[in-house]
């Protein structure tokens, strides 16, 4: 029985706003409970790959992933934005590095805690539930940056990262480079050079204790994809500057290392007073 379909449209919209299919999939995987996570874009679907995306061993990570984690280790404490099930947090903990995780998903945070990492918070990355100037680094890897939806939205998110970090902080963010990407799941083209979009939603299905099939449907997610050149444009009016760009040869996915100029952060703070 599909519980999501049997409710009135208004109720379904409210349920989707509150739904947490990705977090539930993480928690179910951690507890070795059955369930299936899929990405959906209209009739097209793609497997959610919960184990490989959120529970993979560090031995399987590529060099750019490890390099980004190592570079931030010297800037502790680190704020891991969109920490998910806590894989990167656990890596830092194993290396004696202080970090705190934040995720919008209550079930993802619960999963990270049950895996042994207690310093995790439920919160919105656009209004982070942490004090000003509290961290030496921000790690936001999982293409969350694209949820800004536009270059202006990314710029506002970077200002929030600036608020919670100390002078001369470092941030690592990631995205897919549209100049090297013709198609991916949920892909939407854009006439502007170095800009594209992804749109899809997540669904988690499981069998209930009553033997019925339950499906949790999340809201539609819109990601802005931008090239490193476009990311530099987004940082132009923020304290951040793009330093190194890390990626495997020919890969569309990249990580950008951002360095913070303290004077610009103070200028924004004074404007808001």
Residue locations for each model-derived region?
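N-terminal auxiliary segments of SAM/dcSAM-dependent transferases
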Residues: 1-40
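Conserved class I S-adenosyl-L-methionine
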Residues: 75-84
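Conserved SAM/SAH-binding beta-strand->alpha-helix loop
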Residues: 105-107
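SAM-dependent methyltransferase
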Residues: 172-226
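A short acidic, Gly/Pro-enriched loop at the edge of an enzyme's catalytic core
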Residues: 126-138
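A short glycine-rich, Lys/Arg-flanked "PGG" loop and its adjoining helix->strand segment in the class I
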Residues: 153-167
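Conserved SAM-binding strand-loop segment of SAM-dependent methyltransferases
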Residues: 116-128
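A short SAM/SAH-binding and catalytic strip from SAM-dependent methyltransferases
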Residues: 136-155
């Amino acid at each position: 029985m599909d519980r999501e379909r049997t409710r009135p449209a208004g109720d379904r919209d409210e349920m989707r706003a509150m739904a947490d299919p990705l977090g539930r999939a993480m928690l179910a995987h951690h507890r070795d409970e059955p369930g299936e996570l899929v990405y959906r874009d209209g009739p097209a679907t793609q497997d959610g790959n919960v184990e490989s995306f959120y529970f993979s061993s560090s031995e399987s990570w590529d060099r750019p992933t490890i390099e980004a984690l190592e570079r931030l280790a010297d800037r502790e404490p680190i704020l891991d934005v969109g920490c998910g099930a806590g894989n990167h947090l656990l890596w830092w903990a194993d290396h004696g590095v202080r970090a705190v995780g934040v995720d919008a998903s209550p079930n993802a945070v619960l999963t990270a805690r049950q895996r042994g990492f207690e310093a995790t918070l439920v919160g919105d990355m656009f209004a982070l539930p942490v004090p000003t100037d509290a961290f030496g680094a921000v790690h936001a890897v999982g293409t969350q940056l694209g949820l800004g939806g536009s270059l202006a939205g990314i710029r506002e998110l970077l200002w929030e990262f600036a608020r919670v970090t100390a002078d001369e902080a470092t941030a690592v963010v990631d995205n897919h480079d549209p100049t090297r990407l013709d198609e991916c799941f949920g892909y939407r083209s854009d006439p502007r050079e170095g800009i594209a979009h992804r749109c899809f939603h997540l669904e988690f299905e499981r069998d209930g204790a009553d033997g019925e099939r339950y499906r949790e449907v999340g809201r539609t997610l819109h990601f802005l994809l931008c090239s490193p050149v476009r990311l530099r444009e987004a940082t132009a009016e923020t304290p951040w500057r793009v330093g190194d760009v890390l990626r495997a040869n020919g890969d569309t996915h990249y990580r950008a290392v951002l360095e913070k100029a303290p004077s610009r952060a103070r200028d924004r703070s004074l404007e808001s007073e």
